[in-house]
Each structure stands twice: as C-alpha cells, then as structure tokens.
Amino acid sequence: MLGLIHGGVSLSNDEIDVFREKFKKRVMFEIKEADNYPPEARQAWCSGIPGIAEAFAYVLDATGGLSDHDQEMLVKLFREFQHDLDLINGPADVSLCHGIAGSLAAWYRIACLLPDLHLSDDIRFEAEKLRQR
C-alpha cells in the first residue's frame, strides 16, 4: 500500500517503521489540538477524535499491526468519547459527517480491528442511550 505512494517501489521495514513513528506523532498532535474543542466538535468524525482514531487504527493495522500500546490508546480515546457524549446537553446532531452517527460508525469500524476488547457492546450501549434521549 505505501509502496504505491512512492511510485510502486516497496518500502523497507525500516522505512515503514519511520513512517509509522511520524504518523503516530502527527496523530498525537491532532488529538492534542482536538482536546481544545467543545465536546460536540471534539467527537465529530470529520474534525475530531473519532476520525483521527479511525485513520490511526487502519493505517497502523495496514503497516504492521496495532501494538498493545496502540490498542490501549484507542480504548482510552473511546472512553473519552463516552464521557464527552454524557456532556452533550440537549438534542445531538446525528449526521454522519460531524454528528454522533459518524462517530459511532467510526468507533464500530475501529472495534472490528480489536475484537478481543468487545468495544462493539459498549458502542451499541451508547447508541441506545442516545436513542432514548
């Protein structure tokens, strides 16, 4: 996959490792930026943590897999998502781009990469809580 970006030339393991480290640093920067947003924006798929987390999970999975540390970070971000959902008062935007539906969909796709962690059950629980609002 990454070789296509470089004109069809395969990357060495060292080059992939360098890419992964740079990518992780960029993700951490983006997450710190998103931490300054209000909960609605912080948890939007298009500009917030769920979209960043989804890119993080799938790029790392495609370039060597998710380490235990990566998985722990994703779970931590999901727990923050749950906390932020509780902070959103009143009707919630449920659109796919910048609303809760897109965020839940992103977390569900991430959960597919982490089947042993059973995040799907938590996601369904959050969706049900929102439905009952």
Language-model region placement:
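Glycan-recognition and catalytic cores of secretory/periplasmic carbohydrate-active enzymes
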Residues: M1-R133
